[in-house]
Amino acid sequence: MKRKLSWMCAAVIGLSAFPAFMTAAAPATPPLINAEPTEPAPSPATEAPVVAQTAPSREVKLTFAQIAPPPGSMALRGVNPNGGIEFGMRSDEVASKAVLNLEYTPSPSLLPVQSQLKVYLNDELMGVLPVTKEQLGKKTLAQVPINPLFITDFNRVRLEFVGHYRDVCENPASSTLWLDIGRNSALDLTYNMLAVNNDLSHFPVPFFDPRDNRPVTLPIVFADMPDLAQQQAASIVASWFGSRAGWRGQRFPVLYNHLPDRNAIVFATNDRRPDFLRDHPAVNAPVIEMMSHPDNPYVKLLVVFGRDDKDLLQAAKGIAQGNILFRGSSVVVNDVKPLLARKPYDAPNWVRTDRPVTFGELKTYEEQLQSSGLEPAPINVSLNLPPDLYLLRSNGIDMDLNYRYTSPPTKDSSRLDISLNNQFLQAFSLNSTQETNRLLLRLPVLQGLLDGKTDVSIPALKLGAMNQLRFDFRYMNPMPGGSVDNCITFQPVPNHVVIGDDSTIDFSKYYHFIAMPDLRAFANAGFPFSRMADLSDTLAVMPKTPTEAQMETLLNTVGAIGGQTGFPAINLTITDDSAQIADKDADLLIISAIPGKLKDDKRIDLLVQATQSWVKTPMRQTAFPSIMPDEADRAADAQSTVTASGPMAAVVGFQSPFNDQRSVIALLADSPRGYQLLNDAVNDSGKRAAMFGSVAVIRESGVHSLRVGDIYYVGHLPWFERLWYALANHPVLLAVLAALSVVLLAWVLWRLLRILSRRRLDPDHE
């Protein structure tokens, strides 16, 4: 893991890729341009790892569609000439070759040669692409060799457009100054693996490397079919790695007594261990050991040892909660003692709902709340909220905004625009004197996950589980220009804007109440299981003899929930005895098959059994997840039973028959290929977005959801809020009750006035 000695091996491979400068263009075929590389000399103090000649290598193609800001293409302009991409390099790898393949189209109005595209890596100039006469207005292909000596753990490739459309008196804001970078542009990299020491002080590297932007794939190995305690230990570890993976995604393939050809986690006890550990000495305590793969020294295994299953659980909790103390090739987990009980809705990845939250707490990187440039880039703040936050009657969300900015050059010409989930919210002028740089706002919102109605509140700004608050500082910048005889020239100065870390937003005044079943809340936020971040209110129901695919489904699911909450499932309960589910006050997560006690429940709208399946369909199906049909449209119209040989999986949600405040989520599949489809859907954000309602059917064609059957409610509302909620979706009844209330109030006032009038006219009358 340490990078020592010299960069010579990587340098020889990297420099051999640098071709000579060429320019050629044909009208019919996009030209391929090879940039003349600039060769900045690396610092003599630079250290590089020793790469063995036999070290494995891998080739990576990072397209702009994957790693550039959406939509992947870039429009470089005169006033906004910079664009770029970011990528990381694992600490157990070194780059030996890198080539940037660009696809771009320059404006036909540019002056050839004077206009250029400069390519930087970590602020070191890598190459220059002059715009030639033949390229103007045409798609151009170019290759820029990247010196691998300058590739570090975290890297930025910056593209700088230098554009000119005339020799004198240019206007940088001219619409003719542009160069578009295509989303098919790509960075081609060759990585060589490094030999890594068995040292846990770097944990979780190499099993999870935060510099690696790819989804985490971490196989879990058992000696044979795991019992319940081993399933629980593996779930704790998987959910912890999921909490670290976060937005990357995660997958945990399960293997019985078989080692993969990549980094993996292995569970073993003295009595039950994989064959490759047969000669390993017995342990007398919970032990976590890092060792090399027996067939590949570049692959590492994290072995969780124990005398018995109890030791495995303790070791798993040590990984989840005590890994900061790890060092050496192995550690003994002596004890893991809980000190404070978790509270509902305290997931680290969720915005706190018990007090106002500062924007500093919401930052994910240091410079997130500031921006610079003639046109500063938008400042974005993510708000991950519990999906059951009840906002139906909310007057708005209080936000105390503190911001600083460069004074606008002209008065009443610049403004701050605030948007929520791509919907415009409010605008404020940027004063040149900065007399007002603090705002007390109330963000008007509409509940997005409760009932989807849009006739209750105006404006209809939807607030869901995942939200994006955006601040756009828009400056009216004076630009040089004029004519050749009367030219106005000056150097435009970039603007700087900052949202203060002490700005706050307050979600502490709201109840928790949601209409269920709602598979969208499960797919986006792991709800209802994520209500307790440690899954202490969750009971997972597994088959008595789980297959590798069924175990993978369990680990992928708890890993995904860990990624959404940011906390491991240290208190998850797992059972394979359906008789226990009736006695447990918990939400049920069912893997593989619905227990016999529940199969005849009328609340179930779909069942998958081997090659046969049946489903209930509603009277009328809505096309969009955000539209909540009324009770008549949701009613089951028909039940169809089908026998087929093709694979299918499903996610089904319904109310628990044992507790009306608890829910059941069942993950079902009919075959090994069905489980593969199910796991792909759980790990694919696009397919998860297609899940809503009470039933999600997963086939080779994709995910199709239904909203069918009765709705039930989870959470608590005061009686007056309950009354309003019941009437909010029945405007006629609300109008009738309002009219009756007015008549009753008028009659009471009339009677009071009559009594007062009699007393005034006849004081002796009682």
UniProtKB/Swiss-Prot annotation:
Protein name, UniProt field: Cyclic di-GMP-binding protein
Signal peptide: 1-28
Coiled coil: none
Periplasmic domain ranges by topology: 29-729
Gene Ontology biological process: cellulose biosynthetic process; UDP-alpha-D-glucose metabolic process
TM helices/strands, residue ranges: 730-750
Record bears the keyword Ribonucleoprotein: no
Record's bilayer topology term: Single-pass type I membrane protein
Pfam families membership: BcsB
Described function: Binds the cellulose synthase activator, bis-(3'-5') cyclic diguanylic acid (c-di-GMP).
Cell inner membrane recorded as keyword: yes
Keyword line: c-di-GMP, Cell inner membrane, Cell membrane, Cellulose biosynthesis, Membrane, Signal, Transmembrane, Transmembrane helix
